[in-house]
C-alpha cells in the first residue's frame, strides 16, 4: 500500500508538470485557497469539497497560525490580496489581545478560554510580517510575556495562569522560533538568551521523548539560533532531530523512496527538514545534505499530490471554486482545513529558500 501511494504521488506530480502547472504556480494556488475561503472575520476553519460546505468549527490557534502563513505568503509573493486578508485577520485577532494587570505583558485569550503559549508565538510571527502601526509595542509586550514564563530549568510554561501543561511538543518550539525571528528583527539580547537557556531542557526532553511532532518547530528555532550563536552542540541537536525524522520515514535506510503515507502532516515535517538541509549545506555535510534534500523533494511531491486542482480532483467532478488549491487530508479524506494549507505554503516557501524547489 505504501509503495502504491508513492507511485501515485510521483505520477500525479509528473502529470501536473506536463499540463503546465509550474512550481511557482503551486504555492500561489495554495495561498489563493485562503482567499476563496474567507468569512466575515478572517477564514473558515474547515471546508468539505464533497458537500460544498464550510463547517461551523473553530480552532483559534490554527487560525492564528494561518494568519502568519497568509501574511508571509503575501510578502514573499508580493500579493496585495493576501496582504489585505492578513490585515483583516490581524484586526480580528487584535480584539483578543490583552495586557496582564500586574506585569503589563501581552497575551491572547479568546473569551474565557485558556491562555496558550502558542497564541503568543503566532501573534509575534504574524506581526513581524505586517505593517500594523502598533506592531513594535505589541511585539515587545508579547515577548515580555514569553520571557516571564520561562522557568529556572529553561522550560517554557505552555499555559499562562495555570499549573498544568499541554502541547509540550508544539508550543515551546513555536515560541522559540518566534523569539528567534524577533531577535533577528530587533537584536534584543534577552530574546536570544531565552532560546539559549531553553536549549539544554528541550535537548534532554527530545532524548527522553523522541517524536515527530517535536522536530519541525525545534529544528527551525535552533537553525535560526545557530546562525546567531553557532556551536557544535546546537548543530548536533538539529542533525539528531533530522536523522530521527529520516529514520521514521525511511525503514529501508536508503535515504530515498520515503514513506509519506501519513497524508497532509508531511508538510509539517518538510518545514523542519528544510532548515536541517540548509544547515547540512552550510556545514558541508554532504551525506546529510543529500539525504535531507531527498526527503524535502519527495515530501513536496507527496504534498502536491494532495492538492486539489482541476486535473487532480480526486474523482470529484462537481466542485466549487473554494476547493481549488486546497490540501486534502489524504487521498481518501478530502476534508480541507486552514492548517493544512498553512503548512503546505510554508513548506514550499521554505523549500524555495533552500534551493530545493526550483
Indicate where each model-derived feature is located:
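CBM-like carbohydrate-recognition segments
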Residues: 37-47, 55-59, 99, 251, ...
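Solvent-exposed loop and edge beta-strand segments that line ligand/cofactor-binding
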Residues: 48-64, 103-120, 159-172, 186-188, ...
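Active-site cradle of extracellular carbohydrate-active enzymes
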Residues: 35-38, 42-43, 141-174, 178-182, ...
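Well-ordered alpha-helical scaffold segments within catalytic/enzyme domains
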Residues: 64-80, 121-134, 174-188, 217-231, ...
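Low-complexity, Ser/Thr/Pro/Gly-enriched N-terminal "stalk/linker" regions
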Residues: 21-63, 69, 76, 80-104, ...
Amino acid at each position: 500500500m505504501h509503495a502504491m501511494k508513492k507511485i501515485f504521488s510521483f505520477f500525479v506530480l509528473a502529470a501536473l508538470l506536463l499540463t503546465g502547472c509550474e512550481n511557482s504556480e503551486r504555492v500561489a494556488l495554495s495561498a489563493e485557497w485562503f482567499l476563496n475561503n474567507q468569512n466575515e472575520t478572517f477564514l473558515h476553519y474547515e471546508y468539505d469539497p464533497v458537500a460544498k460546505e464550510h463547517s461551523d468549527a473553530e480552532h483559534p490557534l490554527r487560525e492564528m497560525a494561518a494568519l502568519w502563513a497568509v501574511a508571509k505568503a503575501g510578502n514573499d509573493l508580493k500579493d496585495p490580496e493576501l496582504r489585505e486578508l492578513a490585515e483583516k485577520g490581524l484586526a480580528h485577532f487584535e480584539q483578543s489581545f490583552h495586557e496582564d494587570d500586574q506585569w503589563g505583558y501581552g497575551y491572547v485569550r479568546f473569551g474565557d478560554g485558556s491562555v496558550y503559549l502558542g497564541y503568543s508565538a503566532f501573534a509575534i510571527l504574524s506581526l513581524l510580517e505586517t505593517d500594523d502601526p502598533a506592531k513594535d509595542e505589541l511585539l515587545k509586550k508579547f515577548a515580555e510575556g514569553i520571557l516571564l514564563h520561562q522557568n529556572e530549568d529553561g522550560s517554557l510554561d505552555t499555559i499562562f495562569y495555570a499549573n498544568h501543561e499541554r502541547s509540550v511538543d508544539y508550543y515551546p518550539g513555536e515560541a522559540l522560533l518566534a523569539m528567534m525571528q524577533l531577535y533577528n528583527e530587533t537584536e534584543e539580547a534577552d530574546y536570544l538568551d531565552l532560546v539559549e537557556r531553553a536549549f539544554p531542557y528541550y535537548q534532554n526532553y527530545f532524548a527522553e521523548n523522541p517524536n515527530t511532532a517535536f522536530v519541525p518547530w525545534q529544528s527551525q528555532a535552533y537553525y535560526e539560533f545557530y546562525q546567531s550563536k553557532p556551536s557544535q552542540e546546537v548543530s548536533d541537536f538539529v542533525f539528531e532531530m533530522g536523522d530521527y525524522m529520516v529514520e521514521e520515514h525511511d525503514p529501508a535506510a536508503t535515504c530515498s523512496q520515503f514513506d509519506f503515507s501519513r497524508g497532509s502532516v508531511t508538510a509539517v515535517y518538510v518545514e523542519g527538514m528544510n532548515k536541517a538541509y540548509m544547515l547540512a549545506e552550510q556545514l558541508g555535510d554532504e551525506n546529510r545534505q543529500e539525504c535531507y534534500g531527498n526527503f524535502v523533494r519527495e515530501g513536496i511531491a507527496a504534498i502536491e499530490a494532495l492538492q486539489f486542482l482541476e486535473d487532480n480532483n480526486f474523482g470529484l467532478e462537481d466542485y466549487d471554486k473554494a476547493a481549488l488549491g486546497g490540501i486534502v487530508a489524504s487521498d481518501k479524506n478530502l476534508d480541507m482545513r486552514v492548517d493544512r494549507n498553512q503548512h503546505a505554503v510554508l513548506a514550499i516557501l521554505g523549500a524555495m529558500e533552500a534551493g530545493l524547489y526550483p
